[in-house]
From Swiss-Prot:
The gene is folC. 7,8-dihydropteroate binds at D28, L29, G30, T120, Y121, F122, E123, L151, D152, A153. Keywords: ATP-binding, Folate biosynthesis, Ligase, Magnesium, Metal-binding, Nucleotide-binding, One-carbon metabolism. It catalyses: 7,8-dihydropteroate + L-glutamate + ATP = 7,8-dihydrofolate + ADP + phosphate + H(+); (6S)-5,6,7,8-tetrahydrofolyl-(gamma-L-Glu)(n) + L-glutamate + ATP = (6S)-5,6,7,8-tetrahydrofolyl-(gamma-L-Glu)(n+1) + ADP + phosphate + H(+); 10-formyltetrahydrofolyl-(gamma-L-Glu)(n) + L-glutamate + ATP = 10-formyltetrahydrofolyl-(gamma-L-Glu)(n+1) + ADP + phosphate + H(+); (6R)-5,10-methylenetetrahydrofolyl-(gamma-L-Glu)(n) + L-glutamate + ATP = (6R)-5,10-methylenetetrahydrofolyl-(gamma-L-Glu)(n+1) + ADP + phosphate + H(+). Mg(2+) 1 binds at S82, E144. Its EC number is 6.3.2.12, 6.3.2.17. This is Dihydrofolate synthase/folylpolyglutamate synthase. Pathway: Cofactor biosynthesis; tetrahydrofolate biosynthesis; 7,8-dihydrofolate from 2-amino-4-hydroxy-6-hydroxymethyl-7,8-dihydropteridine diphosphate and 4-aminobenzoate: step 2/2; Cofactor biosynthesis; tetrahydrofolylpolyglutamate biosynthesis. One of its GO terms (biological process) is folic acid biosynthetic process. One of its GO terms (cellular component) is cytoplasm. Functions in two distinct reactions of the de novo folate biosynthetic pathway. Catalyzes the addition of a glutamate residue to dihydropteroate (7,8-dihydropteroate or H2Pte) to form dihydrofolate (7,8-dihydrofolate monoglutamate or H2Pte-Glu). Also catalyzes successive additions of L-glutamate to tetrahydrofolate or 10-formyltetrahydrofolate or 5,10-methylenetetrahydrofolate, leading to folylpolyglutamate derivatives. Its cofactor is Mg(2+). It is an enzyme of class 6 (ligase).
Amino acid sequence: MNNMQLKATSPLAEWLSYLEKSHFKPIDLGLDRIKSVAEKLDLLHPVPYVITVGGTNGKGTTCRLLETILLNHGLRVGVYSSPHLLRYNERVRIQNQDLPDEAHTASFAFIDENKTESLTYFEFSTLSALHLFKQAKLDVVILEVGLGGRLDATNIVDSHLAVITSIDIDHTDFLGDTREAIAFEKAGIFRENCPVVIGEPNVPQTMLDQAEKLHCQVARRDVDWLFEQNAENWQWQNKKVRLENLPFCQIPLANAATVLAAVQYLPFDISEQTLRKSLQEVELVGRFQAIKTDKREKLADYLGVPVETLPTIIVDVGHNPHAAKYLSEKLTALKRSIEGKMIAVCGMLKDKDANGVFEHLTPIIDEWHCVTLGGYRGQSGDELVEKLKSHFPNIQATSDNSVMDGVCTALKSAVKNDVVLVFGSFHTVAEFWAVVE
């Protein structure tokens, strides 16, 4: 190890600091470096069955429901996802459990001893996850693509089933600035003669062409399967199966429906009872999540106010226009049942399309509190306010120096019947969650 001697027993924080500096570029897409190490360590086939999940939004919730279903079926399951909210350990789950620091540091040491050249943070962590999965002797692993697909580190593994959640404009510096270019990159996770499930209703031709080239069996939303909802429940069906009176769940319905489509291609005889149970159980932090009693009490203690005075508070990690569109639909439905204002606490990274986000949400948000995020990618609250007012000059917007400053300002102006939304980035939700968790 250059310039730094770390051991398996070194603290996890030291290892993560090393990983962040171990390659000259934080993001360096390509598979040659990581694949050579994976081949050396026999990590390309870590478990009998692999599902890879790609897409612009919805990957995390899709992975979570797949995981819940497979666990309820009695299988040994691992999940690799990113980014984490509070702790690195969230990125690797085995049997629905985060692993202790010691497991990660030992795995990092093993990878570091065997690497032949420098690796990026994500390459290093991907190899470590595969090593941990192989050691655990699992039945199934679910890999969440980090960025794009074709050149993403997770793509060194040949999956048996590929799932695409959605396709929209994001990460244009790396993936291209059109849906067609982005779809081509995401289709890089497809494998010859392996099934592909697509939850995006408007699929670019570049993705379909890639599937045809590889002779993939494709299951497309609204073509090969569909779902519909009413006030009390929802239904899902394809040409062979119809599931009726399904319970609503804590994740977006489109993602849940995509998972039900994916289940049809799994080599496991999963019962309808297991599917229904899993829909009722599934949840994931930061996905249009209302803050519940215990966390409301912690927030009230932090603020020094009576808990009963707090308004409804919702957190969401949505950070691009596609996610903002979904948010606006949820908030519009919610607004019909409340008497108060919609107040937003928004923090975003510099490389995100803030104007596209604002376009979807300004019609529904009454009051904005823009906050500064730290780090080299963080955007200041002043910059966000300037963007807001340049397009919507009459908007009510203020700037704060941190997420919690923004939350405090928002709550001072809020009354019991209002709704406060904390959103814009994983970083935004993480700062808030660290206070209430």
